[in-house]
Amino acid sequence: MEIKEIKVGIADMNTAGSPHRLITIGLGSCVGIALYDKVKGIGGLAHIMLPDSTQFSNIKNPVKFADLAVPLLIKDLEKLGVNKRNLKAKIAGGASMFNFSDKSMIMDIGNRNSAAVKKILEKCSVPILSEDLGGNKGRTMIFDTSQGGVKIRTVGMGIKEI
């Protein structure tokens, strides 16, 4: 079977079975969330932009927000026959892309995104196997659904497996 590469855009998500790859680019302060069921060989990838939807009304794209995207991704995976108890997560991104003179948490969207993703994964009882968070460089996340492997390409730093 030919391996298909499926792009996941900003504020987007997708699912795939083995042996396909889900790829998202442009993870600066955004966070990529790869969820994988080893038993079924099925996974999903979400690219979130913001930590929390509660400050917004009339939400047109719930995948933009960590608190909404993770439960939606889990639901989509369950529709494909995944058992939520088998899901494991790998996450990347959450960089501080801009140097603000105000170092308050409100300005550090990358850190807030990372914290929100960890919180919602814990709430959904999905353990995090590995992470590549923080720093100040953009990342690309490549999720191989055949084994659940995630490679991170960081600007100026090469590729590593998490």
UniProtKB/Swiss-Prot annotation:
The keyword Hydrolase applies. Belongs to the CheD family. Probably deamidates glutamine residues to glutamate on methyl-accepting chemotaxis receptors (MCPs), playing an important role in chemotaxis. It catalyses: L-glutaminyl-[protein] + H2O = L-glutamyl-[protein] + NH4(+). Keywords: Chemotaxis, Hydrolase. GO terms for biological process: chemotaxis. It is an enzyme of class 3 (hydrolase). This is Probable chemoreceptor glutamine deamidase CheD. Its EC number is 3.5.1.44. The keyword Cytoplasm does not apply. It comes from Clostridium kluyveri (strain ATCC 8527 / DSM 555 / NBRC 12016 / NCIMB 10680 / K1). GO terms for molecular function: protein-glutamine glutaminase activity.
